Amino acid sequence: ELSDSTVRMSDLDSQLGSSSVESVVETAVSAVKACIKKTGYLYADTHSTQPVKLDAYNGKKAEFIISGDKLFVKSFDDSNDTFSLFRHTVTNGVVSAAEMLDTSIKACNIIGADVWYRRSVTGSSLCDLYKYSTEKEKIDGDVASFAGLSDGSVLIVKNFVSSSDGEIADLYLYDGKKTSLVAEKAELKNMKYSDKGISFIRSGGDLCIYSKNKLAIIDGGAYNIIAY
């Protein structure tokens, strides 16, 4: 009898009357393979002689981010709607014990050397935005989304609403010290950003470019940005 299997010898015996020997053998082999198969999450790199088992996350939905010598783990809650964020340090293939950074997180990203994430707020569809370096720091509230830009600043999307023009929101920029308004009522479907700045169309058709802390209205009546 296989203690970790639902297949019993009596099941195989009863199949012999209606199935071929080959079919019964295949069922038995599959049951044995299922019992001895390695399951769960493993970490390995060029220093490891054997993969490191990450048993703490077994049986849960988890996603992993590797950044430098850090291993970040998003361990999802039962609803799969939010997750807890853990951080490990990896040294010569040895994975440190988990350090919990926060819970009830909706989304996260590594920007520079910091972890940025949106944390759900009870009773609200929006989130608080945090940055975690050596400790947790709240950057802003009522945040719908965010993105890191090539110059190290962070684009923050707030006051998100749906309209006849599509999804529109107010755009803010965090420069490492403060958050400043870029523009109100920007159409998110047409927004593009690069190392040159941010281009977008405001509700009503104004084509705008934000670059070097200045907002320029390029044209009116625009409905699509092909490239930027």
Please state what every model-predicted region is.
Residues 1, 23-37, 41, 69-75, ...:
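Short beta-strand elements that form the blades of beta-propeller/WD-repeat-like
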Residues 1-59:
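N-terminal "mature head" segments of proteins
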Residues 20-27, 59-67, 103-112, 142-151, ...:
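Repeated scaffold domains used in trafficking and secretory/extracellular systems
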Residues 38-43, 79-88, 123-130, 163-172, ...:
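Structural motif
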Residues 46-48, 89-93, 132-135, 174-177, ...:
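Short loop/turn segments that connect beta-strands within beta-propeller blades
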Residues 49-55, 96-101, 135-140, 178-183, ...:
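A short beta-strand motif characteristic of beta-propeller blades
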Residues 66, 71, 85, 110, ...:
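Fold-core signature of tandem repeat domains
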Residues 205-228:
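Hydrophilic extracytoplasmic domains
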